[in-house]
Amino acid sequence: MLENVKKSLFRVLCLGALCLGGLMAEQDPKELVGLGAKSYKEQDFTQAKKYFEKACDLKENSGCFNLGVLYYQGHGVEKNLKKAASFYSKACDLNYSNGCHLLGNLYYSGQGVSQNTNKALQYYSKACDLKYAEGCASLGGIYHDGKVVTRDFKKAVEYFTKACDLNDGDGCTILGSLYDAGRGTPKDLKKALASYDKACDLKDSPGCFNAGNMYHHGEGAAKNFKEALARYSKACELENGGGCFNLGAMQYNGEGATRNEKQAIENFKKGCKLGAKGACDILKQLKIKV
């Protein structure tokens, strides 16, 4: 669940682009970030760096963050993870939530800094406190996996709940799985289904698949083939092989809709291409080439 750095930068750039306007007579820091964003989009990374440096010197947190990303990526500067960590740290000190999160990533993996799990947890925690969903999800993942700390499902539930409340789809899916299994919380299939459904609404394909399974088998709600079909369909649209396979099976059997063998076979083919072994097996049984 570690953040894709490039995607993070584009989020900031999109925000920064809203700040464009005029020449920099007053050196407004947010406007400097906007000009840096414009230069970045034009692939003038050297100029972008200058604007971000000025903004950071004026204690504009997103300017410091963007400088960190430039050093992490090596755009307009020589790649330097130590400097990336330094600028993420400045951004975090100025309460830029994703700066805290990415600094946590560096401490977790030991990139540009000495590996330090406690510091990673510290920065993920600050990101989460600043309502950055992926910071909460990263904490949840650490306590869920138990690789670098003692496994604690109760804490995992706590942090995945926060992540889900902040609309992190993956966090909602994992929260649903914890309710489903009764780990760190009493088993509650209704809450599991609600979490999977929210994940699906947030376009998390495993959430759609899991919600489909629950509606299909009547877990957490009355059995409802129509709802199951809708969730499997969305999972398949989101490139989930199991979703395509189950969607095809329901169409082949006429569950939730009129039987449609042609469409079922198309979904079996898609599921097989996406790695669903069951879909490949049924195509072999039907003597249909992928």
Swiss-Prot record:
One GO cellular component, as annotated: extracellular region
Catalytic reactions of this protein: a beta-lactam + H2O = a substituted beta-amino acid
E.C. no: 3.5.2.6
Compartment annotation: Secreted
Keyword Secreted appears in the UniProt entry: yes
Species assigned in the record: Helicobacter pylori (strain J99 / ATCC 700824) (Campylobacter pylori J99)
Cysteines paired by S-S bonds: 56-64, 92-100, 128-136, 164-172, 200-208, 236-244, 272-280
Protein name: Putative beta-lactamase HcpC
Gene assigned in the entry: hcpC
Lineage, highest ranks first: Bacteria, Pseudomonadati, Campylobacterota, Epsilonproteobacteria, Campylobacterales
